[in-house]
Each structure stands twice: as structure tokens, then as C-alpha cells.
Amino acid sequence: MPKTPPLRLGVNIDHIATVRNARGGRHPDPVRAALAAIEAGADGITAHLREDRRHIRDNDMERLKAEISKPLNFEMAATPDMVRIALGIKPHAVCLVPERREELTTEGGLDVVGQRESLAPSIARFNDAGIRVSLFIAADPAQIEMAARLKAPAIEIHTGAWCDAITDDEPAKAAEEWRRIVAGAALAQAAGLEVHAGHGLDYATAETIAALPQIVELNIGFYMIGEALFVGLGETVKAMRATMDRGRARVIAA
């Protein structure tokens, strides 16, 4: 039996910047948060530079690239301006996401099938630059297969619908969404894609999904920043890391 790969924790620091921007100025500093998360055990940092700059700013991305010791995952819409910025910063990875100005957060997965003609050149440019590309998509077979055809090295499965169904106490819907995630992760791995997951994850759902052996990275932000208000960011990262390790141990023990 092949060895189960370790599970990485990427901490999304967007909402440190949300708090900062509520009053303007430089406090709290998202780069300081990133450094604290890494010190506590984060394997990487995720930040989303939105077109409207509602939280993370250009200078934040530049400082993150310069100051953190772990990989930077640059979330972005695949627009010409964002592609230019990302190529200039040269993060370890980019995650291409859909984006609408009126949304509170990223509401759905990228339509890779419908946007394949526009996405292909951006993916190729990042591949040529040595920047690892992931596509934030639903666990839909057509989207997964197109991601592989476009030569994206990785996908990030959108876990929001599953997490929302659990929060809303809709067990039938949660079970259906979970089946899609399980099948999607297996299909993606079979297609040669590295599999990540994220959106809406908390301690309970992170522990559950950590048991899927195909998934090698979880990107978690909003829940952790909320928990950090009560116990501190370092303690939250340590608790999430321990939670993920418990879930992963179930794979190893199986």
C-alpha cells in the first residue's frame, strides 16, 4: 500500500487585513499574523489579493513574499492585471478563483470548463515561470478533468457546500456533498492532480476531511481568525494542526 502523504496546513490571513482596513492604518498587520502562524506550525500562508483590494493589499503580498519562510499561496482571479502582479511577485503558488465584487466571500468554484480558453494561457504562463498553479473548483468530474487537460498541477476542492450543510443541520445534503468530495478527490488523484481542499472548514470538518488520503493540503482562514480572537492565533494554529493530525492518523491506521 502506498504511503499516505503528510497533510499541510495553509493559513489564510485575509481577515486580519479585513480588521485592519475597518479603521485604516497598519494595525493589525497581516504579515505579523503570517509570521506568528508559521511559528506555531503552519506549513504555508494563503492570501487573496482581490481586484477591489477589500482586505489584502499589493504591499501585503510583496512583504509576505519577502518576509515569510514558508510557501506563499497567492489567491487571485485570472485577470491580466492579477497575472502580471503575481508574475512579478513570484509566489510559490497561485490559486485561481472566481471573483465577483458583490460577494462577501468566494461563493463557488471556478468554471474551468466554461472558461478554458481564457484560463489556458494564464496557467501556461505560471507553469513556465515555475509558479505552481491550483484551480479552486467544485468536486465535479467535468471540472476536474478539464483542470487536468489544461495542465494545472493541482486543484483545491471547494468544501463550502459540505460545511454549510453541516452547519445548517442538513444531514442528507451534507452526506451528498461529502460523497462528491470523496469521489472528486479520487478522480483528481487518478488524473495526476495534487489535491487540496478549503472553504468553510472548522475543527470538526478539518478532522473529517484529513482522513481522505488523496488530499495533501487544507487552506483554512475565516474560522481560525475567529477562534484566534479568543485564544490567540498561535494556539489556534496548534489546535488545528493537532485536529488535522488526528484525522490523518485514521488513514494511517486503516
UniProtKB/Swiss-Prot annotation:
It is found in: Cytoplasm. It is an enzyme of class 2 (transferase). Pathway: Cofactor biosynthesis; pyridoxine 5'-phosphate biosynthesis; pyridoxine 5'-phosphate from D-erythrose 4-phosphate: step 5/5. 3-amino-2-oxopropyl phosphate binds at residues 12, 23, 200, 221-222. It catalyses: 3-amino-2-oxopropyl phosphate + 1-deoxy-D-xylulose 5-phosphate = pyridoxine 5'-phosphate + phosphate + 2 H2O + H(+). The active site is at 48 (proton acceptor), 75 (proton acceptor), 199 (proton donor). GO terms for biological process: pyridoxine biosynthetic process. Homooctamer; tetramer of dimers. Catalyzes the complicated ring closure reaction between the two acyclic compounds 1-deoxy-D-xylulose-5-phosphate (DXP) and 3-amino-2-oxopropyl phosphate (1-amino-acetone-3-phosphate or AAP) to form pyridoxine 5'-phosphate (PNP) and inorganic phosphate. This is Pyridoxine 5'-phosphate synthase. It comes from Rhodopseudomonas palustris (strain BisB5).
